[in-house]
Amino acid sequence: MLEKVLKRKNALRAKRKLRVRGKIFGTAQKPRVSLFRSNRYLYAQAINDESGLTLASVDGKKLGLGNNKEEAKKIAASFAASLQEAGIKEVVFDRNGYLYHGVVASFADSLRENGIGL
């Protein structure tokens, strides 16, 4: 029973991911911020889809921060600093199929608070 529920949950996330990725595209001036949420950590990277390059990234594991709302704010603050260092002020947010709720929403709100336009 649990396997069936998890398969359905993952399939729905994959559908959402494809639907969202079909509509957004990152450029050098306005890169795509892709967020990945594991069970323990949070990862984000700014991607220029035109050239396929990662412009900036942050790793919650390397920062010693986990995967909850308060730590997502700290990770986003660190990421915003690296984006500003690279001269990026505007981004396109790719929630990567995750619902815009909890950790994902907290990360996005913290990016906005730190001066990055979404």
From Swiss-Prot:
GO terms for biological process: translation. Keywords: Ribonucleoprotein, Ribosomal protein, RNA-binding, rRNA-binding. The keyword Ribonucleoprotein applies. One of its GO terms (cellular component) is cytosolic large ribosomal subunit. The keyword Iron-sulfur does not apply. InterPro entries: Ribosomal_uL18_bac-type, Ribosomal_uL18_bac/euk. GO terms for molecular function: 5S rRNA binding; structural constituent of ribosome. Gene3D superfamilies: 3.30.420.100. It comes from the Bacteria. It holds the Pfam family Ribosomal_L18p. Part of the 50S ribosomal subunit; part of the 5S rRNA/L5/L18/L25 subcomplex. Contacts the 5S and 23S rRNAs. HAMAP family: Ribosomal_uL18_B (MF_01337_B). This is one of the proteins that bind and probably mediate the attachment of the 5S RNA into the large ribosomal subunit, where it forms part of the central protuberance. Belongs to the universal ribosomal protein uL18 family. NCBIfam families: L18_bact (TIGR00060). This is Large ribosomal subunit protein uL18. It comes from Wolinella succinogenes (strain ATCC 29543 / DSM 1740 / CCUG 13145 / JCM 31913 / LMG 7466 / NCTC 11488 / FDC 602W) (Vibrio succinogenes). The lineage of its organism: Bacteria, Pseudomonadati, Campylobacterota, Epsilonproteobacteria, Campylobacterales.
